[in-house]
Amino acid sequence: MKLIAEFNEDIAPIITESTNGKKDYFIEGVFMQADIKNRNGRVYPKEIMEKEVNRYNKEFVEKARAFGELGHPEGPTINLDKVSHLIQSLTLEGSNYVGKAKILSTPNGEIVKALINDGAKLGVSSRGLGSLEQKGNAQYVKGDFQLATAGDIVADPSAPEAFVEGIMEGVEWIMGTNGVLTAVQA
């Protein structure tokens, strides 16, 4: 399986103030898209995306375990020392999966809050593992797709796309019989 990542930049910050005067920060917008050829030349068939998002919602979102990181790491695992937000919802609207995430009070969450306060435009990039099949001029994500996170917070679409292409060409992730993912050179 290869590391697959996608970038979306239509994310809006939301700041709410609770009764105790504390501000809560959220990001909301399109996290992922199905049945559309994206900028990386990939298509996520809706039936594959829907099955995986349903699993992700049950196993991660509903259990408050759907973390995302600030930046885009090289592997499929979540690094708790880099977590910046917790995805609270991920729902299908047409071909779009709209997400909402609460910015946490972690060191990286505080960086995100400062960026929002200073007017930065942030994007999200999904991260998962799966196989790709070339069909015509697009690569189709196959049924073994596994979502690692519906969204890491990133700044610039060009850098994450170039970075992920490099990973996809050089590293494959193999699930061992012990359930541990291992990186191997492709």
Predicted regions and their residues:
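Polar/acidic, low-complexity leader/linker segments enriched in S/T/G and N/D
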Residues: 1-63
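Acidic Ser/Thr/Pro-rich low-complexity disordered segments
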Residues: 42-43, 73-82
